[in-house]
């Protein structure tokens, strides 16, 4: 089992954008000296539920601050960006970091974003797939020559070519059954979302297995990742209230048709929130449900920076003791 971090960079009544960005930098430099494998940065637009609209830009900055840890995007939304620009930036970061960059990507989860970026909502899945093909060609061969309904141009060289053979490691966020099935056919590992229920994660994992097996994909080589929120406190009530405040605005935005309190309770129960026993039990169950080989942790629900670092140290000690 491998462990990394992810940053959501939410802002709310207790956290302003400057504080969120500075904390991300400080925690990144701190964990670079520890036993974590990677850090991935969340992309969001047009709300306080994530102040990073350009995770590749942030990745470049954080790679420059660090020496050994891998860094990349958690969910770079390829449907709303030009695929050649994504490939150029990914290859450049791969070169500059000598292979430490990771490209986590995603389809667009918000219809309003598709419209604002002038993308055809009615052809979203097809556009997503075509964008990935262009990016994948560029990362693996250094060239692309698309001829589809969305992009058509002569063969070009995407410079610089990737440092890593085959391009930087790629993961796709499990945002829908369509995406999961598409990823399974290609053998692209998933990133399971922190706000999906264990039942949804299990359903996605089982569907991935079935489709991958049908297409002859070697599942032993697939290293799915699982996002988990962390708020450890022996005062379990405080941890849960703190986490509730941290995610409330996000849940309101992303789940407008669900009962707010029920969804908040589900997320808190199925992430590592509460006292030590509750955190371990919730994380263990979530991992079992989806079969992830790597866990990405966000310590952001804890308001106090020193408390964040103390909990990071506890996790780091356990990594060293049990997973190295």
From Swiss-Prot:
Q: What is this protein called?
A: Alkanal monooxygenase beta chain
Xref: Gene3D superfamilies: Luciferase-like domain
- Quaternary arrangement and interactors, per the entry? Heterodimer of an alpha and a beta chain.
The organism of origin for this protein: Photorhabdus laumondii subsp. laumondii (strain DSM 15139 / CIP 105565 / TT01)
Q: Does the keyword Oxidoreductase apply?
A: yes
Q: Name one Pfam family in it.
A: Bac_luciferase
Q: What does the record list as GO biological process?
A: bioluminescence
- EC numbers for this chain: 1.14.14.3
Any one GO CC term of this protein is:
cytosol
